[in-house]
């Protein structure tokens, strides 16, 4: 429910009760950040509506490749909280973003890439502990994410050498001009799709068919 993230949590609940859908992706961030009380309310709504939930992990101020260990400790506390909430909500999976370059990345060539891989391995272990699947999303240009294109993901999957799913964000891959390339390269890894549209230049999150994606 990213489109209503700027609305109060109570508005999200109202929209959920009225939504004519079977599947909902919750965003654990901003005004919709979860706690026990909110999880209980979402669980009640989900059971009454017959929803299947997935969850988007926090992404504001979250960088799994942060070079400072204390910063990563904060990141992992937030992500582990999401895993706990996802378990309670019986979410099918959690979507998370890859790490990002920082203002000091150029001083330590390759360090953020290494930390990103190590962090994903740690997340995979946590996900197994909580019995909740996780999947990593392709992110858009021009932002400093470490994983945006097919070539980067190919290197990442080879180095990680673990079974992890890919969330294909079609809007993001459209900006990179690689939607078909992602599907051809990683068809066996794609476990979830974010379907939205744009002009091929900006991450506009338009409705399907309202941009340049060749659906």
Regions picked out by a protein language model, each given a short descriptive name:
Residues 1-5, 27-31, 58-60, 99-101, ...:
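Active-site beta-loop-alpha junctions enriched in small/polar residues
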Residues 1-87:
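N-terminal pre-domain/capping segments
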Residues 3, 33, 73, 113-114, ...:
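Residue-level marker of alpha-helix boundaries and capping positions
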Residues 6-10, 36-40, 69, 80, ...:
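Structural motif corresponding to alpha-helix initiation and N-cap regions
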Residues 23-24, 122-212:
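Acidic/histidine-rich catalytic cores of soluble enzymes
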Residues 51-56, 95-97, 188-198:
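Non-cysteine beta-strand/loop elements that form the S-adenosyl-L-methionine
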Residues 61-66, 102-107, 142-143, 200-206:
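A short acidic, helix-capping loop that chelates divalent metal ions and anchors anionic groups
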Residues 69-165:
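Active-site acidic/histidine proton-transfer and metal-coordination neighborhood
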